[in-house]
């Protein structure tokens, strides 16, 4: 660490941040392997837990999915052996570019199982597909962000808390595999 008043060059500071403790493991909200029983008429969805919110589990359960919490340290091989319908990569804190282990795992999952991501999970999935994620100059933080949904003639006010985004320039000529559940 460093103290106020101590001089530190930019490269040293970036290195310090990139090698900081694993905040994802500290923020996993679900118990790995826990099973929230839904109707199971649809199947099981794995939640790769980078700091998931309980509301995500609740929505999936209301859609009659069982949900299985997966540790961010789990191997792709073990995840694929769980016989899941798909994987949700959850939201969570931090710079997605520093999560190389999770990105490598997701790269091995792509093409083998349907995957979708929320916030940090979307950024991880984008990095695994070769896209670029950039730090926003001014992050989106707070509960007053209007979002227009196509087909609805009004804006919804949303709560947001993110400081990174997928760089639109990085996917202008990329074809991604798609599948449905």
Locate predicted features.
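Short loop/helix-cap segments at secondary-structure boundaries that form the rim of catalytic
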Residues: 79, 126, 168-171
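Active-site environment of divalent metal-dependent phosphoester hydrolases
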Residues: 54, 165-167
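Short, glycine/acidic-enriched loop or turn micro-motifs at the edges of active sites
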Residues: 52, 93, 178
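RNA-binding accessory domains that recognize and position tRNA/RNA substrates
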Residues: 1-73, 77, 81-82, 96
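Cysteine-nucleophile active-site neighborhood
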Residues: 86, 91-157, 163-165
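Conserved small/polar residues in nucleotide/adenosyl-binding loops
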Residues: 172-178
